[in-house]
Amino acid sequence: MKCPFCGHSNTQVLDTRMSEDGDAVRRRRRCEACDRRFTTYERIELFFPAIVKKNGSRVDYTRAKLKDSMRLALRKRPVSAEAIDEAITRIEEKLLALGEKEIPSSQVGELVMRELRKLDKIAYIRFASVYRSFEDVSEFRDVLDEFAASTPRKG
């Protein structure tokens, strides 16, 4: 393993254990040249389906892009980074369970909207307004009416 600090290729493994969530092997290493320590993780390589965009082009799935779009919708909302990561993991599990080589971006968008609806209704509306290309206020009103009908009143 190449040292991230000096680039030397010889490192010594000091400790090996399973990560807390059990999906990776965590290794603590020491560079034999500069003596600095660092941690590496080994994970199973998963093959996600390619995403087919509206214009027909295909792009590789990236967790970072999904996370960025969700974080944008959740900006300044009271939702923890952990809750976002858990939602992304649920989306990824659904994508893998499909067993497809390609899926339309619209299907990913619907999965994101389901998770955002559970996390934060304002974030859901933000995402839906862009994803569904809302043109006027009536489309926002339709979503708000949908929430009002599905939410029990307090009191």
From Swiss-Prot:
All residue ranges annotated as the ATP-cone domain in the record: 49-139
MF (Gene Ontology): ATP binding; DNA binding; zinc ion binding
Alphabetically ordered keywords of this record: ATP-binding, DNA-binding, Metal-binding, Nucleotide-binding, Repressor, Transcription, Transcription regulation, Zinc, Zinc-finger
Keyword Zinc-finger (UniProt): yes
Metal-binding keyword on record: yes
Zinc finger (unnamed): 3-34
Pfam families membership: ATP-cone, Zn_ribbon_NrdR
Chain ranges passing through the membrane: none
Cofactor binding annotation: Binds 1 zinc ion.
GO biological process: negative regulation of DNA-templated transcription
Cofactor section: Zn(2+)
The protein's role, per its UniProt record: Negatively regulates transcription of bacterial ribonucleotide reductase nrd genes and operons by binding to NrdR-boxes.
PANTHER family assigned: TRANSCRIPTIONAL REPRESSOR NRDR
Membership in a protein family: Belongs to the NrdR family.
Name of the protein: Transcriptional repressor NrdR
Organism: Cupriavidus necator (strain ATCC 17699 / DSM 428 / KCTC 22496 / NCIMB 10442 / H16 / Stanier 337) (Ralstonia eutropha)
